[in-house]
A protein has these predicted regions:
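A short, Lys/Arg-rich alpha-helix, primarily the initiator
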Residues: 1-22
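Short alpha-helical DNA-recognition segment
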Residues: 24-42
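DNA major-groove recognition helix of helix-turn-helix/homeodomain DNA-binding modules
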Residues: 52-70
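Short, charged recognition helix plus adjacent turn
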Residues: 69-83
């Protein structure tokens, strides 16, 4: 999986959904790995903002992914500031 950028909850959810599918996992099986319900995985993948940070970190670990924080590129920041 190549580096991907998520600038909002929905983009992050889509990235996690692709990663889960690439690993051949259903939402239910991922939920079992992190001891959460399938509905919790579904909410995270849908970009619902109420999902706890701890749950996000568990999902990242189960999918063998990591969170990287870096400065936003200026071009994207300028475009988003326009809206």
């Amino acid at each position: 999986m190549t580096d991907q950028i998520a600038r909002n909850e929905k983009q992050l959810g889509a990235i996690l959904r692709r990663a889960r599918r690439q690993r051949g996992l259903s939402q239910g099986s991922l939920g079992q790995l992190i001891h959460k319900r399938q509905a919790t995985v579904s909410r995270l993948e849908a970009g619902e903002p109420a999902v706890q940070l701890h749950t996000l970190m568990e999902v990242l670990s189960a999918l063998r992914l990591e969170l990287v924080i870096r400065p936003r590129s200026q071009a994207h920041a300028d475009i988003e500031d326009a809206f």
